[in-house]
């Protein structure tokens, strides 16, 4: 736990409110863009946002009135019990939801959810959750408030800790305490909710029969209220909150989860098990029973390092339920947290600033939801996503050092098991129960799986389809079935579909799944995989530069030195030095720190050959000067061990647990919750074997006895390197507590004479999870097992730096050569071509096929300068990424110079890439089928309406689809405080010798699924990817400037063409794409070409080529016509290749610059680097004569 304790003052209040709004006072169009609602239900979820669903002055964290305690002689008085909590990030519309537009036009989603629920054996919400319930309808509430039921929307805003208590009818409406607040255009009435325990002093538990007015715990003289039960609200909470949690916890009795969570909300001292003992489990053959694993080795083989579990799966089932119980306790810890972040104010969103009228705001909102669809889709398309972790596996007992079985952190793990959910169920002893469900070997993705991961909630499923409808069909990953042809071709066929009719088939959920079927995950045998998580960056601080946290502040500061200011020490860090370099480059007009990924500003600086060469000289000089000074300060002033620091450097970032940062809509909040549950259970499962070891686990009382032990072991993991928490001391606002008077009932005004006592004065607040990635691959094989050593040897080959000739366009200056080719080499174009072509020009140059008389003196001088710069950079380069802008070149160049100072050799370093989501208008008729709102009467009518939609996209704010771009300036992307998706694997280990504390590390890993997840993913072990959807500048302000099998995809073919080079690479790429994609190529634009090539300039060339071919064709565009046009263009450009040149070819290999621009990089080790001059024999690292005090501490080993 952190040593620093913070004090926070919070107000007191009810556990929730029912808001009553007139329809005309709400911005329903904007609300509908953020809501979750299906077409067949009036129930809906909305995000908790100020000036949208709650008032601007809404207080999100408070001390909730959760009960009463007797005080005084003979218990004559009462004191209110107060429990800290924050409001749940989603609100529940249970009346008037029909006024909110459905998230998706897909019909009968409730039917789909019910069918999937029955297939997988989860319980339904049938009737009231308690006996004797009396319903309070929405119409009754409206009538009591004097509002028209048909023109009123009612929704519940509830604290996170007590939402299950609302479902269990343990609350009542306090009509006497209603007040009026202002939201958007009008006044809104809100009714507070309080727990019925307020009328039952000293009852610190869930009341199983709240409608029993003769309950013996009711205080004498108290006027007991009518508990609040509403059928629609209970169904909404059950399906959209509790059932998704039950799926994640593998508990099919959903009401048992609700009962356990509600009990923990009232009883803060409960530590035992809360889930019932009769929980059922999915039957499947565990790999630890001696069967073949996914890796092909038998668990009971004599050469295996693990043994089969002797309990026949009993310990696996026990670990599953105990981890689920621990996760429920962890949810209570989170729900009682006090967070400073407040719900976002929609009126303060930067993307709405300066917009007039409704349509521009809706267009901006529609565009941003398409961006969000990129990260939502990644969680759906990745098979190792936290959404699919529905089962627990036992990898078998590991061998301890003495040869016997010992406790292991890695024995139990979660794995993706939706394909097993329909298997029969077993009890705790493994006996198969009678069940209608049967297992199936068909692992094809279906709508049932989507319903499963959504907890069978139709509103959540509709919202998930809302985002999937904005994802493309994966046209670049092979198997390019056309959804339009599928719908039109089957329109008159009798296809059995339980969800749609002919006229609604284009918008059916099955059609959406069919369109995306190539991207949907496939599940197989249980294997340990990284966890695909969804989270939010709530801080602009991250160590995502090429060398991560090299030379950090905590290491550079001198312990006990009170004379130096912290800011002075901070200026000597690697992070601050790189920032100063960017400032220097900005002053030279080479970089715009507000848009560091763009090189457009260089157009005003580079106007001819001399300015281009001057830019190279300035860039090199600035970087080398900054790096030399930085290393000098580290060694001379800071006494920093530069080589040891490099081996310890890590990339790092933190994903916040703050409940409102990821609450853009109900689905993003849902994904945050699923991520939390997956991470918590991963940690809890790691401690299960340690709890089981040496115990008689088969005992009936074992779980109740050792559940508190597992919970304490889990809590001990906090602040151990992965989950960060902070202790907060809570104080109450001055004044008495306002609450209903128990002697007057629920209609009387609130009494203001109560005192309140906090259940816990000190609260542990979960802040964030830390993700790290080691910068340098060490290749050290000592103290490792044989299996680990073999894996490390395989990794070493991937990290081995290869010495090869550098292609100029793929080197350090490739992006500049492409951007300014037309300016520098206007005649550098193929014969019979009208536009300069850098691929053709540099290919001929490097093949020594360019006639010398076609080059001017200025061009030759520039070519020599480019060649020298590129070769010098390549000689010291250990980063397996070509720069794509000045910012990337500067940070890579500086990182390589630091590596050179540290004598780094042999291995490439780990690098980071941020895939940034974007938005574009759809161009393919297949991608707009789900937006067809008119009934279709024929197959031809479908295509006609789809094309009509494409013609008026500007007036339809919902017509946006997602797009992707990439950048290696990851810190700049993290400054946007984005929503992110990435893979993490959590390692657990003991501390130093004699330290029994368990530490963890959230290792940055990958998302399985390859290009199905994102078209810009590439298989490279040295790279780490993160998909980001920026929030800064859109919905929050910004301050300051795969799996192991690599698939053969169209993107891989295109990248292969680019790597192989060629004079007319554009024509080869275009022909390949047309052959693979077919008629879809007609609608391809710049974003599509960029997704394929990951090269902005080549993508623009391909876009121009595409437009040229369309203009050339005399008939409408066809595949055959396009390929014929490509063939004609190729013949024209190669017509002169067979001619004998009249003069000698320009010799590129012997090209050298006419002037010497000696690099001032110093080689600390004295070793030579190809392309750099050997330093003089008497050259020293730094002149140390002026520092006599430090001279004795610097050794030759350090130098």
From Swiss-Prot:
Residues 1172-1199 are annotated as: Required for nuclear localization. Its main location: host cell. SUPFAM superfamilies: Viral ssDNA binding protein. GO terms for biological process: DNA replication. A motif (Required for filament formation) lies at residues 841-842, 1146-1148. GO terms for molecular function: single-stranded DNA binding; zinc ion binding. It is found in: Host nucleus. One of its GO terms (cellular component) is nuclear viral factory. Keywords: DNA replication, DNA-binding, Host nucleus, Metal-binding, Zinc, Zinc-finger. HAMAP family: HSV_DNBI. Homooligomers. Forms double-helical filaments necessary for the formation of replication compartments within the host nucleus. Interacts with the origin-binding protein. Interacts with the helicase primase complex; this interaction stimulates primer synthesis activity of the helicase-primase complex. Interacts with the DNA polymerase. Interacts with the alkaline exonuclease; this interaction increases its nuclease processivity. Belongs to the herpesviridae major DNA-binding protein family. This is Major DNA-binding protein.
């Amino acid at each position: 736990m952190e040593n620093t304790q913070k004090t926070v003052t919070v107000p007191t209040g009810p556990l929730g409110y029912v808001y009553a709004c007139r329809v005309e006072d709400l911005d329903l169009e904007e609300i509908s863009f953020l809501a979750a609602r299906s077409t067949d239900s009036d129930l809906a979820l909305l995000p908790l946002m100020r000036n949208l669903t709650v008032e601007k002055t809404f207080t999100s964290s408070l001390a909730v009135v959760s009960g009463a305690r007797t005080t005084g002689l003979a218990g004559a008085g009462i004191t209110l019990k107060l429990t800290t909590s924050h409001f749940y990030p989603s609100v529940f519309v249970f009346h008037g939801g029909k006024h909110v537009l459905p998230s998706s036009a897909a019909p009968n989603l409730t039917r789909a959810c019910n069918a999937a629920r029955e297939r997988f054996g989860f319980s339904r919400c049938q009737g009231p959750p308690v006996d004797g319930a009396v319903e309070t309808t929405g119409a009754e509430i409206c009538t009591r408030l004097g509002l028209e039921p048909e023109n009123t929307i009612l929704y519940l805003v509830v604290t996170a800790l007590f939402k299950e208590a609302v479902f269990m009818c343990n609350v009542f409406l306090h009509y006497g305490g209603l007040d009026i607040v202002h939201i958007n255009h009008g006044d809104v009435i809100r009714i507070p909710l309080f727990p019925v325990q307020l009328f039952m002093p000293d009852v610190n538990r869930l009341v199983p029969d709240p409608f029993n007015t003769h309950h013996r715990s009711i205080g004498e003289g108290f006027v007991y209220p009518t508990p609040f039960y509403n059928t629609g609200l209970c169904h909404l909470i059950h399906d959209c909150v509790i059932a998704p949690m039950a799926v994640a916890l593998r508990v099919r009795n959903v009401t048992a989860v609700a009962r356990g969570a509600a009990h923990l909300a009232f009883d803060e001292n409960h530590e035992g098990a809360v889930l019932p003992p009769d929980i059922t489990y999915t039957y499947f053959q565990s790999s630890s029973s001696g069967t073949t694993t996914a890796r092909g080795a038998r668990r009971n083989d004599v050469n295996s390092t693990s043994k089969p579990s002797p309990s026949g799966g009993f310990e696996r089932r026990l670990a599953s339920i105990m981890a689920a119980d621990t996760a429920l306790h962890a949810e209570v810890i989170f729900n009682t947290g006090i967070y400073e972040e407040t719900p976002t104010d929609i009126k303060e969103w930067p993307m709405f600033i300066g917009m007039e009228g409704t349509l521009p705001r809706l267009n901006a909102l529609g565009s941003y939801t398409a961006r969000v669809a990129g990260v939502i889709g990644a969680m759906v398309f990745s098979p190792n996503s936290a959404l699919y972790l529905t089962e627990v596996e036992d990898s078998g007992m590991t061998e301890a050092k003495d040869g016997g079985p010992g406790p292991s952190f890695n024995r139990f793990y979660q794995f993706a098991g939706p394909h097993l959910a329909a298997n029969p169920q077993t009890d705790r002893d493994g006996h198969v129960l009678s069940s209608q469900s049967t297992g199936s070997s068909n692992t094809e993705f279906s709508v049932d799986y989507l319903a499963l991961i959504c907890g069978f909630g139709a509103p959540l499923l509709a919202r998930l389809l809302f985002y999937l409808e904005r994802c493309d069909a994966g046209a670049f990953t092979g198997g390019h079935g056309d959804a339009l042809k599928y719908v039109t071709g089957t329109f008159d066929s009798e296809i059995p579909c339980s969800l749609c009719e002919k006229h609604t088939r284009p918008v059916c959920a099955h059609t959406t799944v069919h369109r995306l079927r190539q991207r949907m995950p496939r599940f197989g045998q249980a294997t340990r995989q990284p966890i695909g998580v969804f989270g939010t960056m709530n801080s602009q601080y991250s160590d995502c530069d090429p060398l991560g946290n090299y030379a950090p502040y905590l290491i550079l500061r001198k312990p006990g030195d009170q004379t130096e200011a912290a800011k002075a020490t901070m200026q000597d860090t690697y992070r601050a030095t790189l920032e100063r370099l960017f400032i220097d480059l900005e002053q030279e007009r080479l970089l715009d720190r507000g848009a560091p990924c763009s090189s457009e500003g260089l157009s005003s600086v580079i106007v001819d050959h001399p300015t281009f060469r001057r830019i190279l000289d300035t860039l090199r000089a600035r970087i080398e000067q900054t790096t030399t000074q930085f290393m000098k300060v580290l060694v001379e002033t800071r006494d920093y061990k530069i080589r040891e620091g490099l081996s310890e450097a890590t990339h790092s970032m933190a994903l916040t647990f703050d409940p409102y940062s990821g609450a853009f809509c109900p689905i993003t909040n849902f994904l945050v919750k699923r991520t939390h549950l997956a991470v918590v259970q991963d940690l809890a499962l790691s401690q299960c074997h340690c709890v089981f070891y040496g115990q008689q686990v088969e005992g009936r009382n074992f779980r109740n006895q050792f559940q508190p032990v597992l919970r304490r072991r889990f809590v001990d993991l906090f602040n151990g390197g992965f989950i960060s928490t902070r202790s907060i001391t809570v104080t109450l606002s001055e004044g008495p507590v306002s609450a209903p008077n128990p002697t007057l009932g629920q209609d009387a005004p609130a009494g203001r004479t109560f005192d309140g006592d906090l259940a816990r004065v000190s609260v542990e607040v979960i802040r964030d999870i830390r993700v790290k990635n080691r910068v340098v691959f060490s290749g050290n094989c000592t103290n490792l097992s044989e299996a680990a050593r073999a894996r490390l040897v395989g990794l070493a080959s991937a990290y081995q730096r290869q010495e090869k000739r550098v292609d100029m366009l793929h080197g350090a200056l490739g992006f500049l050569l492409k951007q300014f080719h037309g300016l520098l080499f206007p005649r550098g174009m193929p014969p019979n071509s009208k536009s300069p072509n850098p691929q053709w020009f540099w290919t001929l140059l490097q093949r020594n096929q360019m006639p010398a008389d076609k080059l001017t003196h200025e061009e030759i001088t520039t070519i020599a300068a480019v060649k020298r710069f590129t070769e010098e950079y390549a000689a010291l380069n250990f980063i397996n990424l070509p720069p794509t802008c000045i910012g990337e070149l500067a940070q890579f160049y500086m990182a390589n110079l630091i590596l050179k100072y540290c004598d780094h050799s042999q291995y490439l370093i780990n690098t980071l890439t941020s895939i940034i989501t974007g938005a574009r208008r759809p161009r393919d008729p297949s991608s707009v089928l789900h937006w067809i709102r008119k009934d279709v009467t024929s197959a031809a009518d479908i295509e006609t309406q789809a094309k009509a939609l494409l013609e008026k996209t500007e007036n339809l704010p919902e017509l946006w689809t997602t797009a992707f771009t990439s950048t290696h300036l990851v810190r700049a992307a993290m400054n946007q405080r984005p929503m992110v998706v990435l893979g993490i694997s959590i390692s657990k280990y003991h501390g130093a010798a004699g330290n029994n504390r368990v530490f963890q590390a959230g290792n940055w890993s990958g998302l399985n699924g390859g290009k199905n997840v994102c078209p810009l993913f590439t298989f490279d072990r040295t790279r780490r990817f993160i998909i980001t959807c920026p929030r800064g500048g859109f919905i929050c302000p910004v301050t300051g400037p795969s799996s192991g099998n690599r698939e053969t995809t169209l993107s891989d073919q295109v990248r292969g063409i680019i790597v192989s080079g060629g004079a007319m690479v554009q024509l080869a790429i275009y022909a390949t794409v047309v052959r693979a994609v077919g008629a879809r190529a007609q609608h391809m634009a710049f974003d599509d070409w960029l997704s394929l090539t990951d090269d902005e300039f080549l993508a623009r060339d391909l876009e121009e080529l595409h437009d040229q071919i369309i203009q050339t064709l005399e008939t409408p565009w066809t595949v055959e016509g396009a390929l014929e046009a490509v063939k004609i263009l190729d013949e024209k450009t190669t017509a002169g290749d067979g001619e004998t040149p009249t003069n000698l070819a320009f010799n590129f290999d012997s090209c050298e610059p006419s002037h010497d621009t000696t690099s001032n990089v110093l080689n600390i080790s004295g070793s030579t680097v190809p392309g750099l001059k050997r330093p003089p024999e008497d050259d020293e690292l730094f002149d140390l004569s002026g520092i006599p005090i430090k001279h004795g501490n610097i050794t030759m080993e350090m130098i």
